[in-house]
Amino acid sequence: MSKRPKLGGFSIPRPTSYSFERSQPPQRLYVPADDPDLDDIAFSDDAAAPSDAPPAGGGGAAGDEEEIDPLDAFMAEIQEEIRAPPPAPKPEALRRADSDDEDDPVESFLRAKKDSGLALAADAMHAGYDSDEEVYAAAKAVDAGMMEYDSDDNPIVVDKKKIEPIPPLDHSTIEYEPFNKDFYEEKPSVSGMSEQEVADYMKSLAIRVSGFDVPRPIKSFADCGFPVQLMNAIAKQGYEKPTTIQCQALPIVLSGRDIIGIAKTGSGKTAAFVLPMIVHIMDQPELEKEEGPIGVVCAPTRELAHQIYLEAKKFAKPYNLRVAAVYGGVSKFDQFKELKAGCEIVIATPGRLIDLLKMKALKMFRATYLVLDEADRMFDLGFEPQIRSIVGQIRPDRQTLLFSATMPYKVERLAREILTDPIRVTVGQVGSANEDIKQVVNVLPSDAEKMPWLLEKLPGMIDDGDVLVFAAKKARVDEIESQLNQRGFRIAALHGDKDQASRMETLQKFKSGVYHVLVATDVAARGLDIKSIKTVVNFDIAKEMDMHIHRIGRTGRAGDKDGTAYTLITQKEVRFAGELVHCLIAAGQDVPNELMDLAMKDGRFRANRDSRKGGKKSGKGKGGGGGGGGGSGARGRGRGVRGVDFGLGIGYNAESGSVPAPRSAALNSLKTGMMQNFKSSFVSASSSNTPSNSAPSRGAPSSFVRPALRGFVSGGTIGGDANQARAVLPAPSFVPASRPAENTVENANPNPESSRDRTRERKRPSGWDR
């Protein structure tokens, strides 16, 4: 049987004989000497076939049928598959199992984004910076970083990549036009006040001011000397008299001074910098083509930026000043065109302003008035490098205003670097709740009791004004909206899943009265200024006390004292109950017994409270520590740290309602008081106080008396009453070491009163001096 060579993967039949008529032998240019076989084809020696036999492959030989052409076999398999019936469908369970085993490309992509900290960034791309915590985390992931996720799949920002800053300008190479920033002249009603009257007026406003050459506070807008057009705009907006922060901030800013304004939320800070900005801009030449802005305001959230934008437009309209709002969620191209056309005032979030500065949409050569509003919140969101980058684009002799509800170290450090000789104005207690807001706390058994409570109280709340309800999660917001909608309430929802257009539409309808109830996450907690809100309901408690303060600050805005804030707290939220007690006390509010009982379940709160009490038993005029009082007439009143007051005024008095001093301050005062008492009890040895050889009688004369040593028990003394002098033995004097002194009355100092005035000479410093 002949063999078939494999050429190119196909079987080629070989003829048994060659004939020149049928086949030409292969032509070769070179034939090796050791290869007599010209066509390199192996032959079988015993193969015999007639010369005219037909070629193999025609189907005649039985041996040829044993080998199958691979191409034919492949095509035959395809035909069989085509003719075969379709396979029966798999059961649903098997299909689901197979699907779970497969790696879905979309799912893998989303998982990879989440692992890298960008799972929520797609919805917040170029959306600015929100006050909703979930959206904040997503937006910051675009500009800044990596996230981790808690058990509820909430993002936690743990690291941020640096936003590429804009190189600061070399202002020494730029020739700036001079400008004026002092427009204030005291009216006789202000300059005529005496120093005592000014001090009393500032005390009534609860204002604390520090700085050089501070202008006096005003009593009305007329004292500012505003133009007639601006005064008409102020009256049109319903402003009757300035708020506390405005009374002191307006004359300072109009005088051209830099200011650090620290005031509680809802105090009217916006008008305190918008009104002087109008005067500042109108004094400068008009903008040329591609110039501007003159006034720049930076805010941490798009809601606050939009709110400032609306407020600024009201006062800029009489002067035809152009105001631009620059924040995320809006077309960047439209904002680019608006800035290119020119505007005098820009209200922006730091991230979007940096983007537009890189796009050359605006130039800062004419900017002379810079405002940083809610500076503490901007630092919380990690905007410090962006703020510094923006400040580096503005001329150094600008006027800079910084407003904040709190003053952390980072904000303090920035203020020292970018402000020039600032005046610091503090209104009320830093970081405290608005005392004008009535706070009501309801302790409920569980979350299931919250909705019935809200349905019962809500109609009465709506009669007083608009209602803002805060919930902790977006799902809870949707649930409350659905429940209230079913019962006919005109309600709207606001949270991080809403796009910017729907948020603006919802807020506009809420302001215009289409909706009477707005339920929201913390997206609305900062900067939302709606004067029609009379009631705030904390349906869920805030994650931290600072956010709680800003939540309830949405009512009682700009001096309105009609606001009420309700907080619903359950039995499981004992930790927050203790913090809420401190907040209520600091704001001068009543603390319900139910809330105090709940707070006492918290070990930390209970330990701190017991330490201020100093134990349960009161002293009865005996020395030593541990008593809650001590001494006659002082049973348990003076409450110091761990039951001691040391006569230094550092204890907590329950009747005065004062806030207890920090532990560090108490210990420092304790140390100082003990050292003073220690030093005053000893005198140095000298020739003038020679020991006497005679012992005084037990009935000591009246000249040998000293007051009891104060301070080692709250309200008490060492060995007796502080208000009653005791006859005691004279203090022993110190003698040289070569002559040991015996602890007898013969070694007593006969003149203790004169020797007490002299300082003891120590050979080495004591431990208290180190």
UniProtKB/Swiss-Prot annotation:
Q: Which Pfam families match?
A: DEAD, Helicase_C
Q: Helicase C-terminal domain: from which residue to which, for each copy? A: 436-599
Residues annotated as binding ATP are A263, K264, T265, G266, S267, G268, K269, T270
Q: Which SMART domains match?
A: DEXDc, HELICc
Record field: catalytic activity: ATP + H2O = ADP + phosphate + H(+)
Supply the PROSITE patterns for this chain.
DEAD_ATP_HELICASE, HELICASE_ATP_BIND_1, HELICASE_CTER, Q_MOTIF
Domain comment (free text): The Q motif is unique to and characteristic of the DEAD box family of RNA helicases and controls ATP binding and hydrolysis.
Q: Tell me the protein's name.
A: DEAD-box ATP-dependent RNA helicase 24
